[in-house]
Amino acid sequence: MKVLMLNGSPRKGNTYRALEEMAKVFAANGIETEIVDVAKEPIRGCQACGACGKLGKCVFDDQVNEIAEKLKEADGMVIGSPVYYASANGALISLLDRLFYSSHFDKTMKVGAAVAVARRSGTTATFDELNKYFTISGMPVASSRYWNNGYGRAAGEIEQDAEGLQTLRVLAANMSFLIKSIALGKEKYGLPEKEEKPAFTSFIR
């Protein structure tokens, strides 16, 4: 079993440290992890060209397609981001928009979790923003004893956020349990049946 972890910070600071805290718990539960830094280089946004409908992947062959292959094989995904203006890192959002729109493999029952790190505020807005990618993709969202937030400005300051780090450890433990439970359920019952063709309703016609 494996969890793909995306570090949405251009630095290995508090967001990266938050993911590391979770990775230790995953390892203790026998789950492999991979932390991928996604904001170190510019990531273009979606151009709405529709080419992915034919190709099955984004026409811009960059980190998005590389991460799509990793997600395809993973049992879970953690997205971590610093907070910029009560939102996630812009490069991360560009990546996620293209990743979830262009990758057409079934993400049903891959477990998701979002982590937001800030100096002071904006974490819950960012947390909600990131969770939207999971809830539109049939991915159960793991929860903890509190919202998955960490606090610190300078690299390493999150070490002083005892409650935040504990929340992340509980999150990883709960996510481990959920991943294992879903694996057993899939083995015994299979995935939920889907209707043959998705329905699309426009609000203007």
What is the meaning of each model-derived region?
Residues E41-L71, F200-R205:
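Cysteine-cluster motifs in flexible loop/terminal segments that predominantly coordinate metals
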Residues L55-Y146:
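Helix-loop-strand module that forms the ligand-binding subsite of alpha/beta enzymes
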Residues P140-R205:
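Glycine-rich phosphate/pyrophosphate-binding loop and the adjoining helix
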